[in-house]
Amino acid sequence: MGREFGNLTRMRHVISYSLSPFEQRAYPHVFTKGIPNVLRRIRESFFRVVPQFVVFYLIYTWGTEEFERSKRKNPAAYENDK
């Protein structure tokens, strides 16, 4: 290779296209097309994703409360002690 970047050796049967940094736009249509597309995708996948998170949250909170309850001593077992 031995050449500087941008003037690399030519390869046969390889077509490459380039665009000047002055001709390209960094974020074209981000606000006009990008954000509405994100909102549309969230709205479409809401009912596929949210129920699973709700079920996971309910199971997690139940398990945490049950674990904390099982760590406590039962006061009824010690009523006859002096």
Curated annotation (Swiss-Prot):
It is a single-pass membrane protein. Residues 2-39 are mitochondrial matrix. Keywords: Acetylation, Disease variant, Electron transport, Membrane, Mitochondrion, Mitochondrion inner membrane, Phosphoprotein, Primary mitochondrial disease, Respiratory chain, Transmembrane, Transmembrane helix, Transport. This is Cytochrome b-c1 complex subunit 8. One of its GO terms (biological process) is hypothalamus development. The modification Phosphoserine is found at S16. Belongs to the UQCRQ/QCR8 family. It is found in: Mitochondrion inner membrane. The gene is UQCRQ. Component of the ubiquinol-cytochrome c oxidoreductase (cytochrome b-c1 complex, complex III, CIII), a multisubunit enzyme composed of 11 subunits. The complex is composed of 3 respiratory subunits cytochrome b, cytochrome c1 and Rieske protein UQCRFS1, 2 core protein subunits UQCRC1/QCR1 and UQCRC2/QCR2, and 6 low-molecular weight protein subunits UQCRH/QCR6, UQCRB/QCR7, UQCRQ/QCR8, UQCR10/QCR9, UQCR11/QCR10 and subunit 9, the cleavage product of Rieske protein UQCRFS1.
